[in-house]
Amino acid sequence: MKNTVLIGGILCASLLASAAVAQEKKIVYASYLSPQHITNPVLEDFFRAVEKDTDGSIKFESHVGGSLLSGRDIPGGVRDGVADAGYFVGSYIPSEMPIDNYIAQFSLWNSEPLVMTGVLNELELFDCPECVDEYRKFNTKYLASYALTPYVYHCKEELSTPEDFKGKRVRGVAAYGDLAKALGAVPINVSPDEAYEALDRGILDCALHSVAAQKARSYGEAAKFVILDPLGGFLGASTFNLRIEKWNSLTPDERAAITKHLPDLVTGAIFNYIAEDEDVKKVYSESGTKFYNADPSFAAAVEEFKAGYREQVIKKGASMGVKDPQAISDTIDRLIGKWRKLLDENGRDKETYARLLNDEIFSRIDTQNPIE
């Protein structure tokens, strides 16, 4: 009798343990960002917060540095189930993600990353049917991203005038490729992490990214001249996207746990970038990098290019296959006005910003119903 009770107890415990394992849902996340990138700690905080709020029913497995999928392969890898979630950059696969690549063309006008982060998320989630459809083609739900701090040129030699750029090979994706051509340079489409090796091997004369890339992407080891004239922050990336089958497999409470922590993920990422830009300037100027403003003729050339480029962007969108590029352009302008006003009226501190993101965007995501 005692043996029967003992065996029964063991079987019961075993079944309960099996049920707990069966209920655990693993989300495999893929990113090409280097392991030392400043966004990774924020993502890890996000993963831990979701795991805690779901009592461990959701578990994240994170692969960074392209260890599972390269930047170009992540969208297809999430679609095909190699990963469940990932960091997408449509500009790396422009023919497959023309809408995302079109939005990236507006990067030159991103002079306020807090404003444009709000714009980007509200646009993608609620105000751009073409955007939603494009992600659906990858069997994916867009969930969150951030607009980068202004891109600048990181060069191997000191360049100052437009004339200095003639014939130089510079990293140029989306609108930045056209800007490079306008300066007489040769645009090279490489990922931010590939740019370091390209600098080191002499394939690139100038990389293009935020100031923080001196550290985050090791540009400071190969490019000691950073032109501080801002070129707008890149808009063509999305930080957290989830395969639709995985989203649908979650309970409403599990989905809500994810959306609850998206404001802190986005806020942490963009505020990290802003702080890191300033810290890097201080530290790397002491170790030999020159941070400087170019000759006024350089800024004038950039502004002249921007003035005539907006109309070209819309025409370019049509040629990319965007159904209504004018509507997306108009929506971006409307949302810029909305978010600039929100921040002017409420403040730009970290806590306020996260609250605004939640109230205006992430709390509106439908977590109760699966995606049909």
What role is predicted for each listed range?
Residues 8-16:
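Bacterial N-terminal signal peptides
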Residues 12, 23-115, 142-372:
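N-terminal secretory/targeting leader peptides
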Residues 16-22:
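Sec/Tat signal peptide C-region and signal peptidase I cleavage site
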Residues 110-137:
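Short, solvent-exposed loop/beta-turn-alpha elements that line the ligand-binding surface or hinge
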